[in-house]
């Protein structure tokens, strides 16, 4: 992904993390609470098999849609 799109995507991931703060269900591996920013970044990495910076530009809109899905479906 080009630098401009990667920068935009990182900001969107941060905004999604802000939105999900306190909304993720509890998990025994995270007794002090879950990190919503890491959750979003890890979900993106798992779905696209690459860090957000390494996803092709052609999938930018697909990544945006997936982040929106994560916001609507905290898990």
What are these model-derived regions, one by one?
Residues 1-75:
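Positively charged, phosphate-engaging catalytic surfaces used for nucleic-acid and nucleotide handling
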């Amino acid at each position: 992904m080009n630098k401009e799109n990667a920068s935009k995507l990182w900001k969107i991931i941060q905004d999604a993390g802000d939105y999900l703060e306190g909304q993720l269900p509890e998990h025994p591996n995270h007794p002090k609470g879950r990190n919503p920013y890491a959750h979003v970044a890890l979900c993106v990495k798992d779905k696209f098999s690459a860090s957000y910076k390494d996803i092709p530009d052609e999938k930018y809109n697909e990544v945006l849609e997936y982040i929106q899905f994560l916001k609507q479906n905290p898990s």
